[in-house]
Amino acid sequence: MFKNTFQSGFLSILYSIGSKPLQIWDKKVRNGHIKRITDNDIQSLVLEIEGTNVSTTYITCPADPKKTLGIKLPFLVMIIKNLKKYFTFEVQVLDDKNVRRRFRASNYQSTTRVKPFICTMPMRLDDGWNQIQFNLSDFTRRAYGTNYIETLRVQIHANCRIRRVYFSDRLYSEDELPAEFKLYLPVQNKAKQ
């Protein structure tokens, strides 16, 4: 999808405030919902994915199962709200051995397991909003001893709220981020009595 796009800096694949946040995504819902709601903490529109079973409610990008993202930027960043329920996401990458590998992170696992085509790992989320930064190049090298070439697919499962999902060429400090990539928490004005 993005193979022939010049890639540097930031490449966003989901923004909850956009007119069609799931334009390039496919949705699967069983015993749950995927809807846009206003989050009270940030007073802004977010995408909520909830389901009784994490494996049957998710969004996947690209929507067409025969297509791939072709994103070469090595950092995946997701701004996600912890709903204090089971949550998992999966990224499929291509390495320099031309092998498709999957990384699955979840908040209900306690150990990392590396198998030839999938690496599952635990993820700890703080209360409220989290910025998940995933160094795909580093994970590919550490898990498989190969070099990351590109990301083919991203799949985000229940249960979470999403503000934005993007790729970047490196990790950026809060000061370096463009305004629309930051998560603004409303300032609490407490007048002194």
Swiss-Prot record:
Keywords: Cell projection, Cilium, Cytoplasm, Cytoskeleton, Flagellum, Microtubule, Nucleus
Subunit organization: Microtubule inner protein component of sperm flagellar doublet microtubules.
Primary location recorded for the protein, binned into one broad class: nucleus
Secretion signal, residue range per the UniProt entry: none
Similarity comment: family membership: Belongs to the CFAP20 family.
Gene Ontology CC terms: axonemal B tubule inner sheath; axonemal microtubule; centriole; ciliary basal body; cilium; motile cilium; nucleoplasm; sperm flagellum
Function, in words: Cilium- and flagellum-specific protein that plays a role in axonemal structure organization and motility. Microtubule inner protein (MIP) part of the dynein-decorated doublet microtubules (DMTs) in cilia axoneme, which is required for motile cilia beating. Involved in the regulation of the size and morphology of cilia. Required for axonemal microtubules polyglutamylation.
Tissues in which the protein is found: Expressed in trachea multiciliated cells.
Protein name: Cilia- and flagella-associated protein 20
GO biological process: cilium assembly; flagellated sperm motility; positive regulation of cell motility; positive regulation of feeding behavior; protein polyglutamylation; regulation of cilium beat frequency involved in ciliary motility
